[in-house]
Amino acid sequence: AYLPNPGRLWELLLPGRLLYLVKNPPGSGKSIPYTALAVEREGRPILLHTHLANDVAASLLAAGRLPGFEQDRVIRREAAAGSSRYDFLLARGGRDFFLEVKSCTLFDGRIAMFPDAVTQRGRKHLEQLAVHARQGTPGGVVFLVHSPQADTFMPDFHTDFTFSRTLLDVKDDLLVKAVGVEWGEDLSLGPRIRNLDIPWGLIEREARDEGGYLLVLEMARSRRVDVGGLGGIAFRKGYYVYAGSARTALTKRVERHLRRRKRFHWHIDFLRDAADSCTALPVRASEDLEHDLAESLGKLAEWSIPRFGASDCRCATHLFGFNTNPTRDPEFIELLLRFRIRRLEAFL
């Protein structure tokens, strides 16, 4: 099935999840027979089709039901301005107003976040909307959150730090709104349309280039690796998750870990060189989460490598083994959501 959504969707597209598909009609030009519209999570469908999210916004605007835009009128969709194109050109208080709509499917508990994958296009939209606003044509962005329980929205500074800092930089130039919607089993739009809170102070505190991180490494075959002071270690075939932290320059630390060519310093450098692939999952935070991450991973892992990455702390290890890819494991995804999103509820 064709999936018109550029996100990672790790927490949604897990094995066994129910997908809502529509058959592509003859002559549609699509070589794939189906298009994915939604996926079920916790008994409710979550809209995946990003183009349909714009149709939802258009319908709410026409009915005067989009919070913050009740009196506005759509002049046209896909409005061009210079080198940019925006989802809507509105008539707002007698003036033109550019509006971008972003579809948000990442949430846990009360908090929703966007984006779930790096979006250079989204960052560019924010920057150019702010330029137009400073030149006299106001604009804004609406994050359409497909969650029935979320009451708070934050940019996903774990996944796209640059987008998140850009949103903070332009928030005083633009109208920034987050709106919650929900869907029925027949994919009809539910009656509740909610204005979500955006806690700018908390975002400013947490969206910093510091915190913890997880590295997911694949070993396609068993092999013995010389790990510095630990000596030779037999790594069995499978996946390994390493928990680390950086009090400053987290982005550069993660980029260094992802590179193969470097001067080896930490235990993880030796394993990264031997691994077939490596995926980084930052967990930006104003508090030290490294040891809590390691403890939680230890409860999920199928084995561990003693003393790995733990020479300067009381933890038994910071490296944990899994037979299958943990990013496809609902329990690992729940752990990631808990540290990235749900723990922030305590600060609301």
State where each predicted segment sits.
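GIY-YIG nuclease catalytic motif and its immediate N-terminal context
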Residues: 195-262, 281-288, 327-348
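Acidic-basic catalytic patches of nuclease active cores, encompassing PD-(D/E)XK
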Residues: 10, 42-75
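OB-fold/S1-family single-stranded nucleic acid-binding modules
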Residues: 28-46, 190-192
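Aromatic/basic micro-patches that form nucleic-acid/chromatin recognition or nuclease catalytic surfaces
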Residues: 173-176, 205, 248-333
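Conserved catalytic cores of phosphodiester-cleaving nucleases, focusing on short active-site segments
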Residues: 86-116, 129
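Non-catalytic C-terminal interaction segments of nucleic acid-processing enzymes
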Residues: 138-140, 144-146, 151-209, 214
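Beta-strand/loop nucleic-acid-binding surfaces
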Residues: 1-10
